[in-house]
Structure formats: structure tokens, C-alpha cells
């Protein structure tokens, strides 16, 4: 039996085939253990089915056995895999243990190595510190020894110089004795040679040099002192003396004409020296319409025009109701004015008669004047007007009358056009030739000093400071101080600077300015370089600007080309080396005077070069306040200014009162004498201020009251406060007094002062009568002064409590109006910021806004606004182009930007600005900005970054203007300069040649731009050791510069010459006198120096005619005019006329002058050169021989000038094929050069070259090669000494020796 349950799986549903309900199969438990053997079924049919038995289907053992086998297999597989994993992990563990052991060993080794290196580092650091200490000690000892050796060397050189001078004096005495017929012993016949001392001075006459390695050069001061200070025509003070228009004119003539122009001269009125074009305007009621139109429409245009040239422009006028008031003020304004304008119709009111008489009839300085005369039908001019027009036209001859009939608008336009022409031509000195020719103006300033940037306003400020400091006519017993200063100049070198000390207001500036005037008068060969330091934190107290200005003043006396660094640190460091280099090129003393040197920012740090020994011909004088003098400077020789004694006090007060026609009573004098006995009341400024207050009060008649108030003031500040109260009392209204307070506060809050036109804009409601009256009173009481067109306070004082330097007047204003409250100062500075920001918003970027706005932001601590201001490209361009490089860097450092950040931000700003540029004018401005950025980056040392903006500037100019435009040459020149500094000489040479070609095509072959390119190419060839090519270019450049009719660095240039010529022309309108004839001659020379040859010829002819009438035809003065006329014709290449006049002048001077007179020598020289130029060699020979005789009589037979004359004569003989006669002359000249200048002097080398050519022509090739080789050795020696610089453009003949440099055939001598 069995069941069918084993045939189905558990849980399956079993269907009922009989229709019944199905059920689920389940496992029926077996309760009875089955038997081991079952009975076979008796009814089984068919074959047996496997597993169909009950045993096979229901057996548990079979089921579990299968499952067991399966699990067993799985377990076995699992076990084997896990065993494998365990074995693998064990292997990895073993491997990791081994790696761990290895790493631990390495770690221990590294730790040991680290400890070893750490110990070595500590020992190395300790050794480094010890080495640094030893180096510092060694450097200190080296500097000490170096300084001692320099002192020793300079002392010995001075002794040598004194011995040489004594030797020359003895030779001169010997020659005089021989001339008198006294037989004396001739040292030349003795066995001993008194000229045996060899003085080797390589390169002392070299004019051209660049900034080579300063550290490797010998002391140029010593080189200069070893050279004898020979006098002679070829030993000129500068290359301007050698040839060209200056050489053709007698040196005495042009020295007299030019010397006063190169120094500060008081011949010009304050208005011409001021930085303001002042128009004094007068009008009547009938012409008010024209005046209103002129002031509204045309005055702003003139203001923009003057701002472009760096000048202020203002129109001062008094309304008709004020004409009867302010008489003294109106007279003062007329005196200050640059031009007077009168608007008038048919009558002249009585209220204007005094002003017209003062402006037109008493116009002693010949100022330009304009009269607008409106003509109306049916009205005739009054008698007073007719008389004014007739008198002024006949006498002054400087008044232009504009007659107008018709519309007032047209009349105002006429007077505007006339005024514009007068301002440009007569006041600013701008020649108007082509209205469209404005391209050259952008770089005019840079041409004056090649690539050196400078600020014309800084120079003008110094000149005005000198004038104001020397204004006093009372010298207060300065003679004893003058003697001490003179002793300093005459003392043997080396000596430290002289310290002039004294209290504030003791007269230090006055003493220095008066002594400078005396030196200029009595020692014209002494170069005076002065700097007056003004208000602290002003431009004048910036050390880098001061040093650069002094350097440029030195450069006026040397035609050198310099690559001057604008980096302030390098500039201040290299200045002593530049001073040594330049001192040798000036044959005379150089005196540097710095007033108030203690006011310079970080003076002790930046003036360290004063401690080192100075070059032998350099003297330094500085003034300081006693309280603020640095301790290291107190060891210098000191000249202390004592307080005034009672005599000086009385003299000063009486002099000031006498000028105002005021006489003090005896009682008043006694009161003053008793009062002025203490140190503060005997101060020069204190006494001057008392005198000013008394004279100012004298007009009101209350001297006793003012004197009593003055006696209550015990110091200068209290006196200034009294002066402020006195001026306030005369102001007519409370509103005017408020204006006074605001004006003084604006001046106090500004950096360099405020101009009058700026005050009119800053103070709404302020009128010209009130402003001019206030300034007049404050100026009279020495509270205010003018400086470069700005109103400033006078006199400095140190306020120790604030540790800042201030004006005494500023201190008084601070106490009176601000009570030391910084918030009030900040308030007025904010008003100034708003004013200058308004100018920037109108695209008016002037030197004033660039200077003041950046400084005001710095003082206010507004860094973000300062940064925005610096990002104004035109503000930064203005600062950079005026040389304020150090100031610009300091501002960027203040806002936290480095050089790379600056460059990046400027690039981004330029790119943004370029997107808005359209039109030629905008593109030209963009090119200028790119060029400025390139130059700025070059000065920062970022040469690779500088190339991109310069290339962009070049592209813009070539596209917007023309590839041959002169400004393209400017871009090429600047880009080449960057390549030179980057040592890419091939690229630089190509660019320089392109710039040269463009400049020659645009300006001609004798323009200063051409000379600049030639100089740049010469420097480039010098760096490449192409010395012959470099020297050729330098000589060519030198000739161009000599022919240029201006002196480099003269601040006013032709404008000064033109104004001086106009003044002289006014002086020659009188009778025939010798003085007028001399003035005419001087006037002709001045026009000649301007290359205005036609006008010069007219005046020289007038001078000659007047001298012949007054003095006679054979007078030496007539020979002077004839000689100058001959020089003029020589310059015009009219050689026949020049020859005739030279012969006539020579005849007169031979009969009238001594045989060795310098004027005779000049005429002989120029006539001989003219003969040689015309090929009349036979006529030239006796003149050259005469030149030798004259120089022998003047300087002695062994003077270099004699050798030069011998060389000239020898060259002439060579040209005449008389080599036999030339040879001994060359040998004699070479012997003189070797004995006097040294065997390695360039003059010896030039003579050897000439002699080599002579031997070559004679066929003695071996001797010629020997001489030429020695000449080249001298040249190489000179080049190595001067840092690879070429020889001077001065030829050995002083300009008229035949050049043999290229006369030798190619391959004449082996290399």
C-alpha cells in the first residue's frame, strides 16, 4: 500500500477528474515505521516503474543525503576558497610586515639626516650672521678708508693745482720781464726739464657720455684737477663756444648779451615772470554790452588757451561805481597786469583818466595795450580821448587800437581775436605761423632735455623765490657774512658744506639771495645752483624733484646725452656720481645753495651725499633752523646769524618808513629801541613786520595806537594776528570779513596755494574789488606772496607741538580762524576737492588739478577716491610728463598697488578708453597715452610690458596720421630706447634709423630732433663697440646743436630773448650816444642768437652807423660792430661781404689794440678760416702764423693753445702740399700737448693721427702705422676710462682744424 502523495510536490493543487473539488497535496506523516521488505503486489501488471514504490518516494534518508551532499560540496568549496584567502592574507601580512620594517628603518635614517641638516642649518645661519657682521665692519672700515683716501687725494690734487697755477704765474712774470728787455735765465736751455711731470688725464675734454657703470670709474674730480686750467679759445666752457653762430660773434659780445639771460635778472616785470596772464579791463557805460559779451563768451576761451600752455588767465576789472575808490589797489593791479584793455566810445570819463594815464602814458615797461574804440554816427570823440590816443600812439608805440562800427557782438569778437594774438606772440612767446601746425607742440617740452621729463613750474617757482628773497634793500650788516662765504669759496678743497643757521625769520634766505647776486656780478664764471625750499609737503620740498632740477641746471653747461633714471631711489643714489661727471665739464667753480634744507622730506636720509667729500671745484652751502638741524650736520663749519643789534633795528625801521614818507618821532624811536632787545623782538622778520604795520598805519594817521599794539606783541605770530585784525578792520562789511576768512582758510588747506581765478570760483559772490583789495593789504603786510601765479603765505616756522613745519602766517591764521581744529581744515579741503573734481568732469586736466587733487586725497586718507583719480589717464599723464615720477609712485603705494598691478590697471583703462575714441584728435590723444604708459613702464623697469603700449602708440599714429608724420618718429625713438635697454641692438638700430629718416624729411637736416636721433644712434653704436661710426654721428649732432640758436634748459628760451630784445628796442629810441650804439649792438647780437638774421643785420648796421658818427670810423667799438656784421654775413654764406668786413675790422684792431689782445685774435682766427674756406690759402698762412704769435704772447710758448695754433698751421701746409714745413709743426705741437696735458690725452691722439697721415703721404708707411697704432691706443684708453664713451666733439683746433679721421685709405694699416 502507499499513497500518491510522493508523486506530487507539497503545496501543489490536485485536480479532481470526477468533477469534485480539488485539494492541495500535503505530506502525510508516517506513524509506523515501514518494514524492511514489502510484499510484491499480486495484481501488478506490466513492467515495474522505478521509484514508484513507497520506499523510494517516502524515504527521508535519501532526501537528506542529497541535501547533505550538496551542502558538503558547497562547504568544501567555501572552505577551500577561505583557506586560499587566508593564505593570501597571510602572505600580504608578511609582505606588509617586511615593508613596515623597511619604512621604519628609512624613517630612522631620515630622522637622523634631518637632525644633521638642522644642525648644519643652525651653524650656517650663525656663520651667515657672523659673516654679515664682518662684512658690515669691513664695509664701514672700507668707507672710512675710502673717505680718508679721497680727502688725501683731493688735498694733494689741490696742492698740485696750486703749484701749476704758481708755475703759470711765474711763467707770465718771466714773459713780461723778457718783453721789457730784461735778460733772464731760460729754463728751456737747462739740463733739467721743468715740464717733465707727466699729467695723464684721459678724456677730460670729452663732452659726450652715457650712464655707464659708475662704480668702475676713477674719480673724475681728480682727473679734472690734474688737468691744468688752461685759458684759450679752444678750451671753451661748453661746446657752444666752438663753432656756429656763437663762435662767429665775438665772445665778449655774446657773453655780455647772454650771461644775464641765463641767470635770474630783475629787468623783467613781475607780470612777465608770473604764471598768470593778467588783463586789466576798463570800460565806460556806453560799452557795457561789449564787455558783457567778452566776459561771458570769450574770456573762458582765453582761459582754456592759457591753461593748455600752463598759465592762469584772469580779467580784473572794477565796476564804474567803484572807480572812485581803491585808487592804490587799482594802481597796483595795473602794475601787475600783463595787458591793459580799454573799451571806450566817444568820451573818456574823469574816473578813468587816472587809470588810463597810469596804464598808457606811464607804460615804462612797454606792456601791450588794446583800445576798443566804438565809432557811432553823429558823435565825435572828446578832446580828452583824442589827446589820449595821440599821446599814446606817439610815445608808447605799443598800443593797438581796434576801431569798430556796428554790432557789439562783432566788436567783442574783434577784441578777442586781437587779444589772442597779443597773448600768444607778445606774452607767451609763441610764434603763429600756420594755424594747422600744432603737431609739434605735444613734444616740445621733451625736446628741451631730450628724454628727460621736467616741470617748468618748479623752475619758475624757484626763480620767483629767489627774486622775492632778494627783494629787500636793507642788507642788515651782511658784509661780515659775505666775507665768510667768500672765504669758503676760496678755501682749498676738500671742505664740507657750510651750514648757515639761525632762528625762523633771522634772514637766512635774504643773506643767501644777496650773496648769489654778488657772485653773479663779480664771478660770472662761477655756476650758482640754488634751491629755496618752500612750504613742507609742497613740490619744492620733494627731494627727487630738487635733485633732478639741480642736475638739469648742470646740463645747461654740457652738451651731454644722458640716460637719466627716473626711479627716485636710483636718482638720489646716482646724483653724486653725476655731479662728479658734470663738474669736470665746467671750467670754474660750482656752488650749490639749498635754503631751508631741513624742511626737505627726510632730509638726513636723502642728503647723505653731503657727508662724503665733494669734487674739488664744488662748494655746498645750506641753511637750517637752529632747532631742527640734524645732529650729524652740526659738525660742519657753521655760520650763525646773530639777532639784530639796536643800530640795525633802527636802520631797518627808518628805511621802511622812509619809503612810505613817514618819519617817526624821537619818542616813538625810543619806545621801539627799548622794546627790541630780546632774542624774539630783535628778529629780522619781527622788526620788518613792525615797520610794515607802522607804514600801513601811517596812511590813516594812527601810528601811536598801532605802535602801542605792536609793543604788546612779544613774538612774530602775535604780530601776524595783529596784522590780521588790522586788515579786518578796514574791510567795509561783515560779508567781506567772511570772504577774508574763507580765502585764508583755502590758502591754508591747499598744498601749494590758490590762484585768484580759483578763489573767484571757490567763493560765490566774491567780486574783484574785494579780492584785489584784500590781497593788496595782506601782501603789503608780508602775510601773502605770489609764487608761480599762486597765493601763498610767507615765512616758515616749526611748530614743535605738532611736529610739522608751517608758515608763521599760517600759524597765525590757524590760531585766529581754525583754533587748530583739523575738522575745519578737512572741511575746506573737501571744498577744494569738489572744485578740482568739477574741472575733471569737464575734461579740464591741468597741472593744478593733477597736483592738488591727488595730494588732497592723500591728506584726507581717501584711498579709494585717490585710486579713482589715479585711474584718470590724463591726471597720471600730467604728473608723469612733468617729472613727478616719485610722487606718482608714492600715491600708488598708498593705495596698495605694486608695479604689475599698476601696469595691468592702466592697460585695462586704456583699452576701455580706446573703445570710445573716434576721430583724429581722439586717436592722437590715445596714442599719446599709450606712449606715456610705455615710458612709465620702462622707467619702472618693466621692459617687456613697455613694448606693447609703445607698439600700439606707433600703430595708432601710423594709421590715424601718416607713416611719415613726426610723431611716428617719436614713437619709434621711444620703442628703440626700450630695445636698447633690453640689449636688442639690432631692432633698436633699425627703429632709430627710421626715426632719423622721418625727422630729416619733416624738419630738415639741421633740426634738434635730428640731433637727438643722431645722439641715440651714437650711443647705440658705442654699446656695440662701433666707435668710429659713433664718433661720426656725434660730431654731426654736435654741429647741429651748435648751430641751434638756443641754450638747452633755459626755461623761457626764445621768449626771454624776445622780451629782452623788445625792452632794448624801447631804450634805443633816443639820441645818438655811445650807450645807445652799444645797446643796438647788443640787440643785434640777441636777434642773431635767435637766428633772426635779417633783423640782426638791421640793428648791427644801425649800431655801426651811430658809432661812426659818435666815435669815429677808426674806434675799436666800430671794429666790434664790423666784426659782428662780418660774422652775420659769414653765417648767411655771403663770404665776399664777410671777407671785406673782417679785413676792415682787422685793420682797425691792429692799429688800436695791443698785439696780444683777445679781440684781435678772434678777428685773425675767423678771417683765416674764411680765407681757407674760399681757397685763398696763401692769404691764410700769414694769419695762422700771426695766431701762433698772439697765443705765444698771451699764454706762453708751452701752452696747449699754442699747440692748437701750430696744428692749424700744419694742416694748412698739408693742404698746400708742403709736408716738409708741416712736419716740425706737428711734432712741436705734440710735444707741447704731451708736456702740458699728458701723453695719453685725446689731443695727443688727434695730433698723432694727423702726423700718421703726413707720414703716409710721404711714403713712410712703417712710421705711419706706428703713429696710427699709438693714436688708437690713446683712444681705447680714453674709451675704457669713460665707460666706453666716445671722444668729444671738440676738435683739436677749436673747430677749424682739417679732419683727418677718414682721410686714411682703406686698409692703410693692418688691424
Swiss-Prot record:
Subcellular location: Cell projection, Cilium
Key words, A-Z: Cell projection, Cilium, Coiled coil, Repeat, TPR repeat, Wnt signaling pathway
Coiled coil regions, renumbered to chain: 81-183
InterPro entries: NPHP3-like_N, NPHP3_ab_dom, NPHP3_hel, P-loop_NTPase, TPR-like_helical_dom_sf, TPR_NPHP3, TPR_rpt
GO biological process assignments: cilium assembly; negative regulation of canonical Wnt signaling pathway; regulation of Wnt signaling pathway, planar cell polarity pathway; Wnt signaling pathway
Organism: Xenopus tropicalis
Pfam families attached to this UniProt entry: NPHP3, NPHP3_hel, NPHP3_N, TPR_12, TPR_7, TPR_NPHP3
Protein name, UniProt field: Nephrocystin-3
GO cellular component, one term: cilium
Amino acid at each position: 500500500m502507499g499513497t500518491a502523495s510522493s508523486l506530487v510536490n507539497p503545496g501543489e493543487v490536485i485536480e479532481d477528474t470526477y468533477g469534485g473539488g480539488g485539494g492541495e497535496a500535503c505530506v502525510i506523516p508516517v506513524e509506523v515505521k515501514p518494514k524492511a521488505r514489502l510484499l510484491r503486489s499480486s495484481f501488478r501488471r506490466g513492467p515495474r516503474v522505478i521509484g514508484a514504490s513507497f520506499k523510494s518516494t517516502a524515504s527521508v534518508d535519501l532526501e537528506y543525503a542529497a541535501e547533505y551532499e550538496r551542502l558538503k560540496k558547497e562547504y568544501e568549496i567555501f572552505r577551500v576558497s577561505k583557506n586560499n584567502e587566508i593564505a593570501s592574507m597571510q602572505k600580504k601580512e608578511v609582505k606588509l610586515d617586511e615593508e613596515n620594517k623597511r619604512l621604519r628603518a628609512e624613517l630612522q635614517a631620515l630622522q637622523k639626516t634631518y637632525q644633521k641638516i638642522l644642525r648644519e642649518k643652525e651653524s650656517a645661519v650663525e656663520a651667515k650672521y657672523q659673516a654679515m657682521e664682518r662684512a658690515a665692519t669691513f664695509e664701514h672700515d672700507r668707507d672710512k678708508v675710502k673717505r680718508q683716501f679721497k680727502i688725501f687725494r683731493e688735498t694733494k690734487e689741490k696742492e698740485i693745482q696750486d703749484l701749476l697755477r704758481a708755475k703759470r704765474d711765474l711763467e707770465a712774470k718771466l714773459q713780461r720781464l723778457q718783453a721789457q728787455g730784461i735778460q733772464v735765465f731760460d729754463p728751456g736751455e737747462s739740463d733739467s726739464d721743468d715740464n717733465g711731470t707727466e699729467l695723464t688725464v684721459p678724456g677730460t675734454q670729452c663732452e659726450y657720455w652715457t650712464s655707464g657703470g659708475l662704480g668702475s670709474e676713477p674719480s673724475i674730480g681728480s682727473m679734472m684737477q690734474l688737468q691744468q686750467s688752461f685759458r684759450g679759445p679752444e678750451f671753451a666752457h661748453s661746446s657752444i663756444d666752438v663753432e656756429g653762430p656763437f663762435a662767429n660773434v665775438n665772445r665778449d659780445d655774446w657773453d655780455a648779451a647772454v650771461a644775464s639771460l641765463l641767470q635770474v635778472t630783475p629787468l623783467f616785470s613781475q607780470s612777465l615772470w608770473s604764471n598768470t596772464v593778467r588783463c586789466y579791463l576798463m570800460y565806460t557805460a556806453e560799452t557795457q554790452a561789449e564787455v558783457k559779451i567778452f566776459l561771458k563768451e570769450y574770456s573762458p576761451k582765453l582761459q582754456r588757451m592759457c591753461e593748455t600752455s600752463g598759465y592762469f588767465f584772469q580779467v580784473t576789472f572794477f565796476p564804474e561805481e567803484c572807480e572812485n575808490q581803491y585808487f592804490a589797489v587799482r594802481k597796483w593791479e595795473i602794475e601787475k597786469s600783463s595787458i591793459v584793455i580799454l573799451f571806450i566810445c566817444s568820451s573818456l570819463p574823469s574816473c578813468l583818466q587816472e587809470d588810463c594815464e597810469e596804464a598808457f602814458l606811464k607804460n615804462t615797461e612797454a606792456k601791450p595795450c588794446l583800445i576798443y574804440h566804438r565809432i557811432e554816427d553823429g558823435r565825435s570823440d572828446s578832446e580828452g580821448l583824442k589827446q589820449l590816443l595821440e599821446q599814446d600812439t606817439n610815445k608808447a608805440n605799443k598800443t593797438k587800437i581796434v576801431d569798430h562800427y556796428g554790432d557789439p557782438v562783432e566788436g567783442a569778437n574783434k577784441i578777442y581775436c586781437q587779444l589772442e594774438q597779443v597773448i600768444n606772440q607778445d606774452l607767451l612767446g609763441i610764434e603763429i605761423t600756420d594755424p594747422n601746425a600744432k603737431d609739434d607742440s605735444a613734444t616740445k617740452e621733451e625736446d628741451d632735455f631730450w628724454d628727460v621729463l621736467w616741470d617748468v613750474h618748479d623752475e619758475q617757482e624757484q626763480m620767483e623765490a629767489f627774486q622775492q628773497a632778494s627783494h629787500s634793500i636793507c642788507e642788515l650788516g651782511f658784509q661780515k657774512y659775505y666775507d665768510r662765504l667768500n672765504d669758503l669759496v676760496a678755501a682749498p678743497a676738500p671742505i664740507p658744506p657750510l651750514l648757515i643757521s639761525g632762528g625762523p625769520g633771522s634772514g637766512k634766505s635774504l643773506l643767501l639771495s644777496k650773496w648769489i647776486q654778488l657772485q653773479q656780478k663779480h664771478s660770472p664764471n662761477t655756476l650758482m645752483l640754488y634751491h629755496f625750499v618752500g612750504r613742507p609737503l609742497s613740490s619744492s620740498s620733494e627731494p627727487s624733484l630738487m635733485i633732478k632740477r639741480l642736475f638739469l641746471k648742470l646740463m645747461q653747461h654740457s652738451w651731454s646725452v644722458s640716460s637719466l633714471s627716473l626711479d627716485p631711489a636710483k636718482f638720489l643714489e646716482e646724483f653724486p656720481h653725476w655731479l662728479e661727471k658734470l663738474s669736470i665739464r665746467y671750467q670754474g667753480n660750482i656752488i650749490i645753495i639749498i635754503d631751508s634744507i631741513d624742511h626737505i622730506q627726510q632730509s638726513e636720509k636723502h642728503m647723505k651725499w653731503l657727508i662724503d667729500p665733494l669734487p674739488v671745484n664744488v662748494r655746498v652751502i645750506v641753511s637750517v633752523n637752529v632747532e631742527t638741524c640734524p645732529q650729524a650736520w652740526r659738525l660742519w663749519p657753521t655760520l650763525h646769524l646773530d639777532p639784530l643789534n639796536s643800530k640795525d633795528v633802527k636802520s631797518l625801521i627808518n628805511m621802511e618808513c622812509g619809503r612810505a614818507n613817514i618819519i617817526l618821532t624821537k619818542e616813538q624811536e625810543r619806545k621801539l629801541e627799548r622794546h627790541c632787545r630780546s632774542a624774539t623782538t630783535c628778529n629780522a622778520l619781527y622788526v620788518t613786520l613792525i615797520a610794515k604795520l607802522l607804514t600801513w598805519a601811517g596812511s590813516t594817521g594812527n601810528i601811536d595806537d598801532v605802535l602801542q599794539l605792536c609793543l604788546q606783541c612779544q613774538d612774530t605770530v602775535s604780530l601776524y594776528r595783529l596784522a590780521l585784525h588790522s586788515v579786518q578792520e578796514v574791510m567795509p562789511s561783515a560779508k567781506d570779513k567772511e570772504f577774508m576768512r574763507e580765502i585764508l582758510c583755502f590758502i591754508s588747506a591747499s598744498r601749494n596755494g590758490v590762484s585768484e581765478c580759483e578763489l573767484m570760483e571757490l567763493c560765490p559772490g566774491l567780486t574783484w574789488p574785494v579780492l584785489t583789495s584784500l590781497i593788496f593789504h595782506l601782501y603789503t603786510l608780508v602775510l601773502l606772496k605770489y609764487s608761480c601765479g599762486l597765493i601763498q603765505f610767507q615765512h616758515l616756522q616749526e611748530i614743535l607741538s605738532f611736529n610739522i613745519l608751517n608758515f608763521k602766517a599760517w600759524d597765525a591764521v590757524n590760531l585766529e580762524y581754525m583754533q587748530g581744529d583739523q575738522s575745519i581744515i578737512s572741511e575746506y579741503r573737501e571744498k577744494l576737492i569738489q572744485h578740482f573734481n568739477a574741472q575733471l568732469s569737464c575734461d579740464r586736466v591741468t597741472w593744478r588739478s593733477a597736483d592738488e587733487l591727488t595730494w588732497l586725497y592723500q591728506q584726507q586718507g581717501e584711498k579709494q577716491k585717490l585710486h579713482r583719480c589715479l585711474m584718470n589717464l590724463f591726471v597720471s599723464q600730467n604728473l608723469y610728463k612733468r617729472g613727478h615720477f616719485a610722487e606718482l609712485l608714492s600715491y600708488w603705494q598708498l593705495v596698495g598697488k605694486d608695479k604689475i598691478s599698476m601696469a595691468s590697471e592702466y592697460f585695462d583703462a586704456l583699452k576701455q578708453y580706446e573703445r570710445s575714441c573716434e576721430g583724429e584728435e581722439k586717436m592722437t590723444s590715445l596714442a599719446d597715452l599709450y606712449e606715456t604708459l610705455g615710458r612709465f613702464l620702462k622707467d619702472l623697469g618693466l621692459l617687456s610690458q613697455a613694448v606693447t603700449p609703445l607698439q600700439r602708440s606707433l600703430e595708432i599714429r601710423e594709421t590715424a596720421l601718416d607713416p611719415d608724420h613726426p610723431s611716428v618718429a617719436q614713437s619709434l625713438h621711444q620703442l628703440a630706447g626700450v630695445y636698447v635697454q633690453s640689449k636688442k641692438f639690432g631692432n633698436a638700430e633699425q627703429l632709430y634709423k627710421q626715426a632719423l629718416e622721418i625727422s630729416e624729411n619733416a624738419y630738415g637736416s639741421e633740426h634738434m630732433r635730428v640731433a637727438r636721433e643722431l645722439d641715440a644712434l651714437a650711443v647705440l653704436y658705442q654699446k656695440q663697440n662701433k666707435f668710429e661710426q659713433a664718433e661720426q654721428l656725434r660730431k654731426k649732432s654736435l654741429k647741429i646743436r651748435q648751430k641751434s640758436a638756443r641754450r638747452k634748459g633755459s626755461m623761457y628760451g626764445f621768449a626771454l630773448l624776445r622780451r629782452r630784445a623788445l625792452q632794448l628796442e624801447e631804450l634805443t629810441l633816443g639820441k645818438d650816444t655811445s650807450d645807445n650804439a652799444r645797446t643796438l649792438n647788443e640787440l643785434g647780437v640777441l636777434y642773431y642768437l635767435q637766428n633772426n638774421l635779417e633783423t640782426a643785420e638791421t640793428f648791427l648796421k644801425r649800431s655801426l652807423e651811430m658809432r661812426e658818427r659818435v666815435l669815429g670810423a677808426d674806434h675799436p667799438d666800430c671794429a666790434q660792430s664790423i666784426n659782428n656784421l662780418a660774422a652775420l654775413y659769414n653765417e648767411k654764406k655771403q663770404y665776399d661781404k664777410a671777407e671785406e668786413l673782417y679785413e676792415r675790422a682787422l685793420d682797425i684792431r691792429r692799429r688800436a689794440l695791443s698785439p696780444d689782445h683777445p679781440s684781435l685774435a678772434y678777428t685773425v682766427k675767423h678771417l683765416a678760416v674764411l680765407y681757407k674756406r674760399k681757397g685763398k690759402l696763401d692769404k691764410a698762412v700769414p694769419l695762422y702764423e700771426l695766431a701762433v704769435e698772439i697765443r705765444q704772447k698771451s699764454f706762453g710758448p708751452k701752452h696747449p693753445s699754442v699747440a692748437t695754433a701750430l696744428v692749424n698751421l700744419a694742416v694748412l701746409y698739408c693742404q698746400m702740399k708742403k709736408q716738409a714745413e708741416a712736419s716740425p709743426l706737428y711734432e712741436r705741437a705734440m710735444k707741447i700737448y704731451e708736456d702740458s696735458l699728458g701723453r695719453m690725452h685725446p689731443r695727443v691722439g688727434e695730433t698723432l693721427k694727423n702726423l700718421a697721415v703726413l707720414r703716409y703721404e710721404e711714403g713712410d708707411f712703417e712710421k705711419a702705422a706706428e703713429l696710427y697704432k699709438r693714436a688708437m691706443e690713446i683712444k681705447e684708453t680714453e674709451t675704457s676710462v669713460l665707460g666706453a664713451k666716445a671722444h668729444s666733439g671738440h676738435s683739436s683746433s677749436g673747430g677749424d682744424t682739417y679732419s683727418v679721421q677718414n682721410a686714411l685709405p682703406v686698409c692703410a694699416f693692418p688691424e
